């Protein structure tokens, strides 16, 4: 029984699904998808639970959410192993994901009060108040790269605001989704407040097509995000929050410490086997001898990166991709870039057939035209050379996406110029692109999405503002507008 609907574990009536470890092939989870009828059942359960949940005090909702945080802490080792085994990422990285889930609880509570709490200002004849109200029933679509942390960034603020939820994890990480849901169950959420439906495209389409849905919060690929945007077009009454990745540029303008710059680049491009939406996909490198030296060192260090299993000791920097198919897609993209005229500096290699263990790839594309503006979701870095900083910024902005952008340079003036001209929601200076502050908004512009998911600004789209003018008594104004006559004289 792998669906959690209205406080009960039930068996899915849709297609059967088996999840294997992407490296070893070990069977980790088996179950059935939710069919359309069960998706509708989950929505009705969430709708029925909404009035009572929304009418609880914020403190009562906070108690449940903090109980979930405590359960994450006490079950950290177990959840770390589940996420690592299911995604293929190393144990150390899965542990950081669970830690991030725990930390986001306190941040989300603070964000609710700062971003969407209640405010009151006195007026001569009363008061003006601002309150926030939950939307109602929200669908949350989770991604596979951070199957605990990223859905958590939607679910926690949505629950705190008083919404009820239908959560659909990625079909590639059903085990992690179920494990997290069991902790929510232990936290004592009332039946129907949070529901779990497993499944792939058919389940997702049934969920997004629900008429009684008040909103949809999505993290995933641009293609799926665009489909959801089209599907919900003409429905302005529904909130739609999209985080869709990017084709992110990293500008290496001047690196006094080449090894430090190489380390930053590897952290930006290859951490999580390149499966972070903020990963650097395009390396923009200044022409000249220093750029040549940097590139040679980057290739030399990157070729030492050997992917390993989730529990290898010593622990590897990167593990496998989410699936062998995902790894093959990266290899295919590399071959296509070569065919366009790209010059391979480091070839990505699938270490063993039937696994997702893929080594990083680096390919130079300087002078090649017609390169697709697409996100290759894996450890493949494309390199372009530039002659001046204005050209670098033009190249950085030459994308329909706008998630993250970074600069390596000792010159504050160049960073200030980048801040003014960059089209990206995250712009870092001498820091990896994959680094983001939990108390800052996360997200981008253009094809990278609209709202800012993950805790701090998520509070904004999990509740709507209600403005009020208030007075505890009603009296006739001392001064009336022209044309109004409230005298006792009888009009003849």
UniProtKB/Swiss-Prot annotation:
One of its GO terms (biological process) is arginine catabolic process to succinate. GO terms for molecular function: aldehyde dehydrogenase [NAD(P)+] activity; succinylglutamate-semialdehyde dehydrogenase activity. The active site is at residues 243, 277. NAD(+) binds at residues 220-225. It catalyses: N-succinyl-L-glutamate 5-semialdehyde + NAD(+) + H2O = N-succinyl-L-glutamate + NADH + 2 H(+). This is N-succinylglutamate 5-semialdehyde dehydrogenase. Belongs to the aldehyde dehydrogenase family. AstD subfamily.
């Amino acid at each position: 029984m792998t669906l959690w609907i209205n406080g009960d574990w039930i068996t899915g009536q849709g297609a059967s699904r088996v999840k294997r470890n992407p490296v070893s092939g070990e069977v980790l989870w088996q179950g059935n998808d939710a069919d359309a009828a069960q998706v509708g059942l989950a929505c009705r359960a969430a709708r029925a639970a909404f009035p009572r949940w929304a009418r609880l005090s914020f403190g009562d909702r906070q108690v449940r959410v903090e109980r979930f945080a405590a359960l994450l802490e006490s079950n950290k080792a177990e959840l770390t192993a589940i996420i690592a085994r299911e995604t293929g990422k190393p144990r150390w990285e899965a542990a950081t994901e669970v830690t991030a889930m725990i930390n986001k609880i306190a941040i989300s509570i603070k964000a609710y009060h700062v971003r969407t709490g209640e405010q009151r200002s006195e007026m001569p004849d009363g008061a003006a108040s601002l309150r926030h109200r939950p939307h109602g029933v929200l669908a949350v679509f989770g991604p596979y790269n951070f199957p605990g942390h990223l859905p958590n960034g939607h679910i926690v603020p949505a629950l705190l605001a008083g919404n009820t939820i239908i959560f659909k994890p990625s079909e590639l990480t059903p085990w992690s989704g179920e494990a997290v849901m069991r902790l929510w169950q232990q936290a004592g959420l009332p039946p129907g407040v949070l529901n779990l439906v497993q499944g792939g495209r058919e389940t997702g389409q049934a969920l997004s097509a629900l008429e009684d849905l008040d909103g949809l919060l999505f993290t995933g690929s641009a293609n799926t995000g665009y489909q959801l945007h089209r599907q919900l077009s003409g429905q302005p009454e529904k909130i739609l929050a999209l985080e869709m990745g990017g084709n992110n540029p990293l500008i290496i303008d001047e690196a006094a410490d080449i090894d430090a710059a190489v380390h930053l680049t590897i952290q930006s491009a290859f951490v999580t086997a390149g499966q972070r939406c903020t990963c650097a996909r395009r390396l923009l490198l200044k022409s000249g001898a220093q750029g040549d030296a940097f590139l040679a060192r980057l290739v030399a260090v990157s070729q030492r990166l050997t992917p390993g299993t989730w529990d290898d000791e010593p622990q590897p920097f990167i593990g496998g991709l989410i699936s062998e198919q995902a790894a093959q897609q990266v290899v295919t993209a590399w071959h296509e870039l070569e065919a366009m005229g790209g010059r391979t500096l480091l070839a990505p290699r699938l270490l063993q057939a039937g696994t997702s263990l893929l080594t990083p790839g680096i390919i130079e594309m300087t002078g090649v035209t017609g390169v697709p503006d697409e996100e290759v979701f894996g450890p493949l870095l494309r390199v372009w050379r530039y002659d001046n900083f204005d050209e670098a910024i033009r190249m950085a902005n030459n994308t329909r996406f706008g998630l993250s952008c970074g600069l390596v340079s000792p010159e504050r003036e160049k960073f200030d110029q980048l801040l003014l001209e960059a089209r990206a929601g995250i712009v870092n200076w001498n820091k990896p692109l994959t680094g983001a502050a939990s108390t800052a908004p996360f997200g981008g512009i253009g094809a990278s999405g609209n709202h800012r998911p993950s805790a701090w600004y998520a509070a904004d789209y999990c509740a709507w503002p209600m403005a009020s003018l208030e007075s505890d008594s009603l009296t006739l104004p001392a001064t009336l507008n022209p044309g109004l006559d409230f005298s006792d004289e009888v009009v003849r």
